[in-house]
Protein backbone atom coordinates (compact mmCIF):
# COMPACT_ATOMS: atom_id res chain seq x y z
CA UNK A 1 0.00 0.00 0.00
CA UNK A 2 2.87 2.36 0.85
CA UNK A 3 4.45 1.61 -2.54
CA UNK A 4 1.16 2.43 -4.27
CA UNK A 5 0.96 5.81 -2.50
CA UNK A 6 4.55 6.68 -3.37
CA UNK A 7 4.00 5.72 -7.00
CA UNK A 8 0.88 7.88 -7.14
CA UNK A 9 2.77 10.85 -5.71
CA UNK A 10 5.59 10.36 -8.20
CA UNK A 11 3.17 10.20 -11.12
CA UNK A 12 1.55 13.45 -10.04
CA UNK A 13 4.94 15.15 -9.69
CA UNK A 14 6.01 13.98 -13.15
CA UNK A 15 2.89 15.05 -15.02
CA UNK A 16 3.39 17.36 -17.98
CA UNK A 17 7.18 17.00 -18.08
CA UNK A 18 9.00 16.53 -21.42
CA UNK A 19 9.78 12.86 -22.03
CA UNK A 20 9.85 11.09 -25.37
CA UNK A 21 10.32 7.47 -26.44
CA UNK A 22 12.14 5.80 -29.33
CA UNK A 23 11.57 2.05 -29.37
CA UNK A 24 12.17 -0.82 -31.76
CA UNK A 25 13.43 -4.38 -31.96
CA UNK A 26 17.02 -5.37 -31.26
CA UNK A 27 19.64 -4.36 -33.82
CA UNK A 28 17.33 -2.01 -35.72
CA UNK A 29 19.49 1.11 -35.23
CA UNK A 30 17.71 2.91 -32.37
CA UNK A 31 20.80 4.13 -30.57
CA UNK A 32 22.42 5.78 -33.60
CA UNK A 33 19.17 7.58 -34.43
CA UNK A 34 18.69 8.64 -30.80
CA UNK A 35 22.17 10.17 -30.82
CA UNK A 36 21.39 12.16 -33.97
CA UNK A 37 18.16 13.47 -32.44
CA UNK A 38 19.88 14.33 -29.15
CA UNK A 39 22.65 16.17 -31.02
CA UNK A 40 20.10 18.37 -32.74
CA UNK A 41 17.81 19.14 -29.84
CA UNK A 42 19.93 18.71 -26.69
CA UNK A 43 18.00 15.88 -25.04
CA UNK A 44 19.39 13.56 -22.39
CA UNK A 45 19.04 9.83 -23.07
CA UNK A 46 17.53 7.15 -20.84
CA UNK A 47 18.19 3.54 -21.82
CA UNK A 48 15.10 1.32 -21.56
CA UNK A 49 16.99 -1.87 -22.33
CA UNK A 50 16.40 -4.64 -19.81
CA UNK A 51 19.97 -5.98 -20.12
CA UNK A 52 21.97 -2.74 -20.14
CA UNK A 53 21.06 -2.28 -16.47
CA UNK A 54 23.64 -4.98 -15.61
CA UNK A 55 27.24 -3.99 -14.99
CA UNK A 56 29.95 -5.89 -16.94
CA UNK A 57 27.51 -7.05 -19.63
CA UNK A 58 28.85 -4.46 -22.04
CA UNK A 59 29.60 -5.87 -25.49
CA UNK A 60 26.79 -8.42 -25.60
CA UNK A 61 24.17 -5.80 -24.69
CA UNK A 62 25.53 -3.18 -27.13
CA UNK A 63 25.94 -0.50 -24.46
CA UNK A 64 26.93 2.97 -25.63
CA UNK A 65 30.61 3.77 -25.14
CA UNK A 66 31.74 5.62 -22.02
CA UNK A 67 32.28 8.80 -24.03
CA UNK A 68 28.75 8.53 -25.45
CA UNK A 69 27.29 8.00 -21.98
CA UNK A 70 28.94 11.20 -20.81
CA UNK A 71 28.09 13.19 -23.94
CA UNK A 72 24.38 12.29 -23.89
CA UNK A 73 24.01 12.16 -20.08
CA UNK A 74 22.77 8.56 -20.22
CA UNK A 75 20.63 7.01 -17.51
CA UNK A 76 19.41 3.44 -17.07
CA UNK A 77 22.83 1.80 -17.58
CA UNK A 78 24.98 -0.19 -15.10
CA UNK A 79 22.42 -0.05 -12.29
CA UNK A 80 23.16 -3.44 -10.67
CA UNK A 81 25.77 -6.21 -10.67
CA UNK A 82 25.41 -8.72 -13.51
CA UNK A 83 24.66 -11.55 -11.06
CA UNK A 84 21.84 -9.66 -9.29
CA UNK A 85 18.13 -9.77 -10.08
CA UNK A 86 16.25 -6.76 -11.42
CA UNK A 87 12.66 -5.97 -12.37
CA UNK A 88 10.40 -3.31 -13.83
CA UNK A 89 9.53 -1.79 -10.44
CA UNK A 90 13.21 -1.26 -9.63
CA UNK A 91 13.71 0.23 -13.08
CA UNK A 92 10.89 2.71 -12.58
CA UNK A 93 12.38 3.73 -9.23
CA UNK A 94 15.73 4.40 -10.90
CA UNK A 95 14.04 6.18 -13.80
CA UNK A 96 12.23 8.47 -11.33
CA UNK A 97 15.52 9.66 -9.86
CA UNK A 98 17.10 10.14 -13.28
CA UNK A 99 14.14 12.03 -14.75
CA UNK A 100 13.84 14.28 -11.71
CA UNK A 101 17.54 15.21 -11.98
CA UNK A 102 17.35 15.99 -15.71
CA UNK A 103 14.12 17.96 -15.37
CA UNK A 104 15.58 19.94 -12.48
CA UNK A 105 18.30 21.01 -14.93
CA UNK A 106 15.61 21.92 -17.49
CA UNK A 107 16.50 19.13 -19.89
CA UNK A 108 14.04 16.95 -21.76
CA UNK A 109 14.64 13.19 -21.95
CA UNK A 110 14.48 10.72 -24.83
CA UNK A 111 14.03 7.14 -23.59
CA UNK A 112 15.49 4.71 -26.11
CA UNK A 113 15.45 0.91 -26.14
CA UNK A 114 13.54 -2.24 -26.87
CA UNK A 115 12.10 -3.37 -23.54
CA UNK A 116 8.34 -3.25 -23.99
CA UNK A 117 7.75 -3.91 -20.30
CA UNK A 118 9.80 -0.87 -19.23
CA UNK A 119 8.00 1.26 -21.82
CA UNK A 120 4.62 0.07 -20.56
CA UNK A 121 5.60 0.57 -16.91
CA UNK A 122 6.51 4.20 -17.60
CA UNK A 123 3.54 5.04 -19.81
CA UNK A 124 0.70 2.84 -18.52
CA UNK A 125 1.66 1.96 -14.95
CA UNK A 126 2.92 -1.10 -13.13
CA UNK A 127 1.07 -4.29 -12.34
CA UNK A 128 0.60 -4.84 -8.58
CA UNK A 129 1.06 -8.62 -8.84
CA UNK A 130 2.99 -10.43 -6.08
CA UNK A 131 6.81 -10.34 -6.28
CA UNK A 132 8.84 -13.25 -7.60
CA UNK A 133 8.71 -16.50 -5.66
CA UNK A 134 12.37 -17.50 -5.97
CA UNK A 135 11.92 -21.09 -4.81
CA UNK A 136 9.08 -21.74 -7.26
CA UNK A 137 10.86 -19.85 -10.05
CA UNK A 138 13.99 -21.98 -9.65
CA UNK A 139 11.84 -25.09 -10.01
CA UNK A 140 10.02 -23.75 -13.08
CA UNK A 141 13.19 -22.60 -14.84
CA UNK A 142 14.29 -26.23 -15.07
CA UNK A 143 11.26 -27.08 -17.24
CA UNK A 144 11.03 -26.73 -21.01
CA UNK A 145 8.49 -24.44 -22.67
CA UNK A 146 6.00 -27.22 -23.54
CA UNK A 147 5.91 -28.52 -19.96
CA UNK A 148 5.44 -24.98 -18.66
CA UNK A 149 2.61 -24.36 -21.10
CA UNK A 150 0.86 -27.56 -20.03
CA UNK A 151 1.11 -26.50 -16.38
CA UNK A 152 -0.28 -23.04 -17.11
CA UNK A 153 -3.12 -24.55 -19.14
CA UNK A 154 -4.00 -26.76 -16.20
CA UNK A 155 -4.02 -24.07 -13.50
CA UNK A 156 -5.04 -20.94 -15.46
CA UNK A 157 -6.43 -21.73 -18.94
CA UNK A 158 -7.70 -18.18 -19.46
CA UNK A 159 -4.13 -16.86 -19.27
CA UNK A 160 -2.89 -19.06 -22.12
CA UNK A 161 -4.53 -16.91 -24.80
CA UNK A 162 -3.25 -13.74 -23.16
CA UNK A 163 0.37 -14.55 -22.26
CA UNK A 164 3.18 -14.60 -24.86
CA UNK A 165 3.47 -18.39 -24.96
CA UNK A 166 6.59 -18.28 -27.13
CA UNK A 167 8.48 -16.75 -24.20
CA UNK A 168 9.17 -19.17 -21.28
CA UNK A 169 9.79 -16.25 -18.90
CA UNK A 170 6.26 -14.93 -19.48
CA UNK A 171 4.78 -18.39 -18.94
CA UNK A 172 6.78 -18.80 -15.73
CA UNK A 173 5.57 -15.45 -14.43
CA UNK A 174 1.92 -16.34 -15.14
CA UNK A 175 2.29 -19.68 -13.33
CA UNK A 176 4.14 -18.05 -10.44
CA UNK A 177 1.45 -15.40 -9.89
CA UNK A 178 -1.43 -17.86 -10.09
CA UNK A 179 0.15 -20.43 -7.76
CA UNK A 180 1.38 -17.81 -5.28
CA UNK A 181 -1.76 -15.67 -5.03
CA UNK A 182 -4.54 -17.87 -6.40
CA UNK A 183 -5.46 -15.01 -8.76
CA UNK A 184 -4.80 -14.96 -12.50
CA UNK A 185 -2.18 -12.56 -13.83
CA UNK A 186 -4.92 -11.22 -16.11
CA UNK A 187 -6.83 -9.96 -13.06
CA UNK A 188 -3.70 -8.49 -11.50
CA UNK A 189 -2.97 -6.59 -14.72
CA UNK A 190 -6.25 -4.74 -14.30
CA UNK A 191 -4.95 -3.25 -11.04
CA UNK A 192 -2.08 -1.11 -12.26
CA UNK A 193 -0.47 1.92 -10.66
CA UNK A 194 -0.60 5.34 -12.27
CA UNK A 195 1.69 5.90 -15.28
CA UNK A 196 5.01 7.55 -14.56
CA UNK A 197 4.83 10.10 -17.38
CA UNK A 198 1.94 11.80 -19.16
CA UNK A 199 1.56 13.16 -21.76
CA UNK A 200 4.40 11.93 -23.98
CA UNK A 201 5.42 11.26 -27.58
CA UNK A 202 6.46 7.75 -28.59
CA UNK A 203 8.02 6.59 -31.86
CA UNK A 204 8.44 2.96 -32.98
CA UNK A 205 10.96 2.41 -35.76
CA UNK A 206 11.30 -0.69 -37.91
CA UNK A 207 13.16 -1.83 -41.04
CA UNK A 208 12.15 -4.08 -43.95
CA UNK A 209 12.69 -7.70 -42.89
CA UNK A 210 15.68 -8.46 -45.19
CA UNK A 211 17.55 -5.35 -44.02
CA UNK A 212 16.72 -6.05 -40.36
CA UNK A 213 18.19 -9.55 -40.67
CA UNK A 214 21.36 -8.26 -42.36
CA UNK A 215 21.78 -5.62 -39.66
CA UNK A 216 21.36 -8.20 -36.91
CA UNK A 217 23.96 -10.57 -38.39
CA UNK A 218 26.40 -7.69 -38.91
CA UNK A 219 25.84 -6.55 -35.33
CA UNK A 220 26.65 -10.00 -33.92
CA UNK A 221 29.89 -10.19 -35.93
CA UNK A 222 30.94 -6.76 -34.67
CA UNK A 223 30.30 -7.85 -31.08
CA UNK A 224 32.69 -10.77 -31.54
CA UNK A 225 35.26 -8.45 -33.13
CA UNK A 226 35.01 -6.16 -30.09
CA UNK A 227 35.79 -9.04 -27.71
CA UNK A 228 32.52 -10.71 -26.72
CA UNK A 229 34.27 -14.03 -26.06
CA UNK A 230 36.87 -12.37 -23.83
CA UNK A 231 34.13 -10.53 -21.92
CA UNK A 232 32.28 -13.81 -21.33
CA UNK A 233 35.47 -15.51 -20.16
CA UNK A 234 35.99 -12.74 -17.59
CA UNK A 235 32.45 -13.34 -16.30
CA UNK A 236 33.12 -17.08 -16.02
CA UNK A 237 36.31 -16.40 -14.07
CA UNK A 238 34.43 -14.05 -11.73
CA UNK A 239 31.16 -15.89 -11.16
CA UNK A 240 31.58 -19.37 -12.60
CA UNK A 241 29.82 -21.00 -15.53
CA UNK A 242 26.67 -21.55 -13.46
CA UNK A 243 26.22 -17.79 -13.06
CA UNK A 244 26.81 -17.22 -16.79
CA UNK A 245 24.23 -19.90 -17.66
CA UNK A 246 21.67 -17.99 -15.56
CA UNK A 247 22.47 -14.74 -17.37
CA UNK A 248 19.38 -13.57 -19.25
CA UNK A 249 21.25 -11.52 -21.86
CA UNK A 250 21.24 -13.43 -25.14
CA UNK A 251 24.55 -14.97 -26.19
CA UNK A 252 26.55 -15.23 -22.97
CA UNK A 253 25.39 -18.74 -22.09
CA UNK A 254 26.07 -20.01 -25.62
CA UNK A 255 29.50 -18.39 -25.73
CA UNK A 256 30.35 -19.82 -22.30
CA UNK A 257 29.42 -23.32 -23.45
CA UNK A 258 31.46 -22.79 -26.62
CA UNK A 259 34.52 -21.69 -24.66
CA UNK A 260 34.39 -24.48 -22.08
CA UNK A 261 32.95 -27.38 -24.04
CA UNK A 262 33.57 -26.50 -27.71
CA UNK A 263 30.11 -27.77 -28.65
CA UNK A 264 30.01 -25.70 -31.84
CA UNK A 265 32.38 -24.12 -34.30
CA UNK A 266 32.44 -20.32 -34.55
CA UNK A 267 29.98 -20.12 -37.46
CA UNK A 268 27.50 -22.40 -35.68
CA UNK A 269 27.85 -20.30 -32.53
CA UNK A 270 27.10 -17.06 -34.39
CA UNK A 271 24.12 -18.69 -36.11
CA UNK A 272 22.72 -19.97 -32.78
CA UNK A 273 23.00 -16.48 -31.28
CA UNK A 274 21.39 -14.97 -34.37
CA UNK A 275 18.41 -17.34 -34.08
CA UNK A 276 17.89 -16.38 -30.43
CA UNK A 277 18.16 -12.65 -31.13
CA UNK A 278 15.91 -12.94 -34.19
CA UNK A 279 13.29 -14.71 -32.06
CA UNK A 280 13.59 -11.99 -29.42
CA UNK A 281 13.13 -9.31 -32.09
CA UNK A 282 9.90 -10.99 -33.22
CA UNK A 283 8.61 -11.03 -29.63
CA UNK A 284 9.47 -7.34 -29.27
CA UNK A 285 7.43 -6.50 -32.38
CA UNK A 286 4.50 -8.53 -31.05
CA UNK A 287 4.62 -6.51 -27.82
CA UNK A 288 4.86 -3.13 -29.53
CA UNK A 289 1.86 -3.93 -31.73
CA UNK A 290 -0.21 -3.96 -28.54
CA UNK A 291 0.89 -0.45 -27.50
CA UNK A 292 -1.69 2.03 -28.87
CA UNK A 293 0.39 5.11 -28.06
CA UNK A 294 3.23 4.22 -30.45
CA UNK A 295 3.58 5.99 -33.82
CA UNK A 296 4.98 3.42 -36.26
CA UNK A 297 7.66 4.28 -38.84
CA UNK A 298 9.07 1.80 -41.39
CA UNK A 299 12.46 3.11 -42.50
CA UNK A 300 12.86 1.61 -45.97
CA UNK A 301 15.95 3.57 -47.06
CA UNK A 302 18.37 6.31 -45.89
CA UNK A 303 16.11 9.05 -47.27
CA UNK A 304 13.17 7.83 -45.17
CA UNK A 305 15.43 7.59 -42.14
CA UNK A 306 16.51 11.20 -42.67
CA UNK A 307 12.89 12.33 -43.05
CA UNK A 308 11.92 10.46 -39.90
CA UNK A 309 14.69 12.09 -37.86
CA UNK A 310 13.76 15.54 -39.19
CA UNK A 311 10.07 14.95 -38.44
CA UNK A 312 10.87 13.56 -34.99
CA UNK A 313 12.97 16.61 -34.11
CA UNK A 314 10.21 18.96 -35.29
CA UNK A 315 7.54 17.13 -33.27
CA UNK A 316 9.66 17.10 -30.12
CA UNK A 317 10.62 20.78 -30.49
CA UNK A 318 6.97 21.74 -30.99
CA UNK A 319 5.95 19.67 -27.94
CA UNK A 320 8.55 21.44 -25.78
CA UNK A 321 7.73 24.92 -27.11
CA UNK A 322 4.04 24.38 -26.47
CA UNK A 323 4.31 22.85 -23.01
CA UNK A 324 7.75 23.61 -21.57
CA UNK A 325 9.16 26.92 -22.72
CA UNK A 326 11.52 27.00 -19.74
CA UNK A 327 13.26 23.79 -20.87
CA UNK A 328 16.42 23.72 -22.97
CA UNK A 329 16.38 22.53 -26.57
Swiss-Prot record:
- Keywords recorded for this protein, A-Z: ATP-binding, Magnesium, Nucleotide-binding, Transferase, tRNA processing
* Matching Pfam families: IPPT
User: What GO molecular function terms would the record report?
Assistant: ATP binding; tRNA dimethylallyltransferase activity
Q: Name one GO biological process term.
A: tRNA modification
Q: What class of enzyme is it?
A: transferase
Q: Which cofactor does it need?
A: Mg(2+)
Quaternary assembly:
Monomer.
- What is the name attached to this protein's record? tRNA dimethylallyltransferase
Record organism: Methylacidiphilum infernorum (isolate V4)
Amino acid sequence: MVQDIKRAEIALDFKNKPVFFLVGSTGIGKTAIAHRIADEIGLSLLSIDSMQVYRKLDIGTAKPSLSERIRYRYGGIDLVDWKDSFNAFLFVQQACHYLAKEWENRRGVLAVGGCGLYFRAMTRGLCNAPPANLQLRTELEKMDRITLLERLTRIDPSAVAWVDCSNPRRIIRAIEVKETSGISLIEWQKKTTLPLVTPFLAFWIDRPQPEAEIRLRRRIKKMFERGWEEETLMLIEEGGMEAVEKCKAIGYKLIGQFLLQKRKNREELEEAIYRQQHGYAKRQKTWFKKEPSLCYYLLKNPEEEYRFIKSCIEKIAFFIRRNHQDFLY
